[in-house]
Amino acid sequence: MLTRSVLRKAPRAFSPFLQKRNLALHEYISHDILRKFGVDVPRGAPARSGEEAEKVARDLKVTDLVVKAQVLAGGRGKGQFDSGLRGGVRPVYDATEARMFAEQMIGHKLITRQTGPAGKICNVVYVCERKFIRKEYYFAILMDRENQCPMIVASDQGGVDIETVAAENPSAIIKRSLPNSPNLDPHIAEELVDKLGFSSSSKPKAVDAIVKLYKVFNDCDATQVEINPLAETTDHKVLCMDAKLNFDDNAEFRHSNIFVLRDISQEDPDEARAAKVGLNFIKLDGNIGCLVNGAGLAMATMDIIKLHGGEPANFLDVGGNANAEAIREAFSLITNDPKTTAIFVNIFGGIVRCDVIAKGLISVVSALNLNIPIICRLQGTNQGAAKEVINNSGLRIFSFDDLDEAAKKACRFSRVVEMAREADVNVSFELPL
């Protein structure tokens, strides 16, 4: 799977936040989309039970098959299920064997290096024919955000972890920025096919596949079309064996037929919950919860926390919806993470007045009865009235005007709470006189 370590070797402007917010689809759905654009893929169908997997295998009428767990994570082949089964991609040779492996996958969590120890639930398997491959290639189209155009990333070392290839043999990675156009110039595809080393018999098919994959990327508002491997078979056909398609969430209004296929079970439940109420929330690995309005201010808040030795627990942009209901939901999401040791509220009041935000904040904090420190910085319209409201509330909300000072205090409080938890003691905070 194309992830951050590969992108570091590509232009710098790939934002992890933008990547994470894009719609990702299961392999079997991606294959269906590719088929509609005339791209050749192996025959196959999804199954949601062992019985269905057996039927699909029989209907394919071949003895060389593969059963693939459908989870949105890389490293499936080397993963392990909580059922004890090793490997989320298993070759099988008859329908009975397909059923056996499907039953050990469906309803179980697959743990890979990308899912972490929690794993991801497998609700569907993809049963498809297995092809005899002469050569495997890697091919992807994604957005070059620095140059504001599509970019091809390709390699003649496909079928393996592209991150490993990029780390061990960076010269094997081909990158090319493309002009913004509804169609790919076939000459660009021909040049790439020559560099990758397709056989002369398969070159026309490879060019055709690449041109059509670009059409998928453009027409579907995709942010990434990744094929690994793009395979040349022993009979010189060119097939997209495994496909990962990501789509721009901002284009949902144009592609409701695609976005309706989103599998919420594969997404972080807190992030999915936040999206439903219009909050832009992304979990991170730190322990200082952040509640901010505006993506730019949210990024700056995380930067200054890290500058002072802290680690943000989340990215949370409430946007222009910083009312009591949004703040309540935001606090609920932040405190749902047991790692959180402090909460930094950093709001700039423009159209929404600071005193209104302060009243909403006080209402939420009073109801939640939190035992972790809250550091608050409200700047903008009616900021003086907001500070007065907070100071008169009697709640332990630490209010600051200066961003740097507020960030330092958040980091210090966080360390105090962390040390108290390690020592298994309670700690309380009082406002200075």
UniProtKB/Swiss-Prot annotation:
Substrate binds at N293, G350, I351, V352. Its EC number is 6.2.1.5. Residues 31-273 form the ATP-grasp domain. Mg(2+) binds at N228, D242. It is an enzyme of class 6 (ligase). Its main location: mitochondrion. GO terms for molecular function: ATP binding; magnesium ion binding; succinate-CoA ligase (ADP-forming) activity. Binds 1 Mg(2+) ion per subunit. It is found in: Mitochondrion. Residues 1-23 form a transit peptide. Its cofactor is Mg(2+). Pfam families: ATP-grasp_2, Ligase_CoA. The keyword Hydrolase does not apply. GO terms for biological process: succinyl-CoA metabolic process; tricarboxylic acid cycle. NCBIfam families: PRK00696.1, sucCoAbeta. This is Succinate--CoA ligase [ADP-forming] subunit beta, mitochondrial. It comes from Schizosaccharomyces pombe (strain 972 / ATCC 24843).
